C-alpha cells in the first residue's frame, strides 16, 4: 500500500499526518533543549517557540522556554510561560514559586504576593512560600509583615538559615538590635564560617556600639573572603571610631583598590537576572519538591 501511495501520489492518512507532526515536534524541541544547554539562549527560544506551534500543550517545552527567556532577560515572557503551566497544573506549588521568583527579578512584588497566596492555599506548611512572601513584603516596604512571614517559616523549620539571615537583616534595618542579635548569634553558632552570617554579626555589633567585637568579626569575614569590599569599607568606619586612623585609612584604600579592580555588581533587575543565570540547574517543575 505504501508503494502504491508513492507511485500514484496517494494522500497521507490522518494518522500519518499526526505521526509526522509528532516527529517534527520532537526534533525541534530536542534542538531547543540542546541549544539551551549550550547557553545559546536566543536559538533555544526560537526552536522552542516553533515546537509550541506544533504542540501548545507540551508543558515541559514551556518550562524550557521560560528558562531561555529568563537567561535572555525577557522576564515578562518567562512569567507568561509559567502562567500557562500553572493554569494547566493548578496544584503545582513548584511552578507558583518559580513565578514568585521571576516576579522578584522583575521587582513586581504585588505579583509575588498573589502567587504566594495561591501557594499557601494549597499548602500552608511550605516554608519556601513564606520565604518568598517575606521577600515580597520587604520589597513593598512592609517590614513587620516580612518578619512575621519569616518567623512563621522558622517556626516550621528551625534550621531554615536563609530565613533567619533575612529576618536578622530586616530587624537590623529596623534598628531592632536585640532581636537581630538573636538571629545573628543562632546563625553563627550553627554555620560560623558563612560569609553572610559573619557580615550580619559584624553589622549588628557595629550598630550596638560593640566596636572591638565588630572589628574582630569583620576580620573573620575577610578570612572567608579576602575580597569583601563591604567588610573593608565598614571596618574602616569601626576602626576610625576606635581612634585607629591608620587602620581605617588602610581599609579604605583596600576597598577603593578592590572596587577599581572588580566592578561593583549592578543593582536591581539586571543583577537578579545574572544571579538566576548562574543557577541554571533545571527546575523540577513537575514535582512539588520545594
Task: Give the ranges of each region predicted by the language model.
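Alpha-helical segment of the N-proximal tetratricopeptide repeat
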Residues: 18-60, 64-74, 94, 98-107, ...
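Structural signature of tandem alpha-helical TPR/SEL1-like repeats
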Residues: 39-46, 72-84, 106-118, 139-152, ...
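Terminal, low-structured helical/coil segments at or just beyond the last alpha-helical repeat
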Residues: 1-17, 247-290
Amino acid at each position: 500500500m505504501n508503494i502504491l501511495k508513492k507511485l500514484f501520489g496517494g494522500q497521507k492518512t490522518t494518522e500519518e499526518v499526526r505521526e509526522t507532526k509528532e516527529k517534527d515536534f520532537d526534533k525541534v524541541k530536542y534542538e531547543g533543549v540542546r541549544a539551551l544547554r549550550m547557553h545559546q539562549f536566543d536559538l533555544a527560544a526560537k526552536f522552542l517557540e516553533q515546537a509550541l506551534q506544533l504542540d501548545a500543550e507540551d508543558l515541559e517545552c514551556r518550562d524550557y522556554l521560560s528558562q531561555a527567556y529568563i537567561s535572555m532577560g525577557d522576564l515578562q515572557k518567562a512569567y507568561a510561560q509559567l502562567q500557562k503551566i500553572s493554569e494547566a497544573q493548578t496544584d503545582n506549588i513548584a511552578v507558583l514559586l518559580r513565578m514568585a521568583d521571576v516576579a522578584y527579578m522583575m521587582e513586581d512584588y504585588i505579583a509575588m504576593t498573589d502567587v504566594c497566596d495561591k501557594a499557601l492555599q494549597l499548602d500552608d506548611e511550605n516554608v519556601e512560600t513564606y520565604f518568598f512572601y517575606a521577600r515580597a513584603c520587604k520589597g513593598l516596604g512592609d517590614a513587620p509583615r516580612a518578619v512575621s512571614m519569616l518567623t512563621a517559616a522558622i517556626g516550621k523549620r528551625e534550621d531554615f538559615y536563609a530565613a533567619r539571615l533575612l529576618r536578622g537583616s530586616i530587624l537590623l534595618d529596623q534598628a531592632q538590635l536585640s532581636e537581630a542579635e538573636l538571629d545573628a548569634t543562632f546563625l553563627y553558632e550553627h554555620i560560623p564560617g558563612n560569609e553572610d552570617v559573619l557580615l550580619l554579626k559584624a553589622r549588628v555589633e557595629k550598630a550596638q556600639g560593640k566596636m572591638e567585637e565588630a572589628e574582630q568579626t569583620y576580620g573573620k569575614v575577610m578570612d572567608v573572603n579576602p575580597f569583601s569590599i563591604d567588610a573593608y569599607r565598614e571596618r574602616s568606619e569601626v576602626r576610625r571610631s576606635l581612634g585607629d586612623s591608620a587602620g581605617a585609612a588602610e581599609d579604605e584604600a583596600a576597598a577603593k583598590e578592590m572596587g577599581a579592580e572588580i566592578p561593583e555588581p549592578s543593582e536591581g533587575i539586571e543583577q537578579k537576572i545574572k544571579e538566576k543565570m548562574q543557577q541554571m540547574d533545571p527546575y523540577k517543575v513537575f514535582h512539588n519538591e520545594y
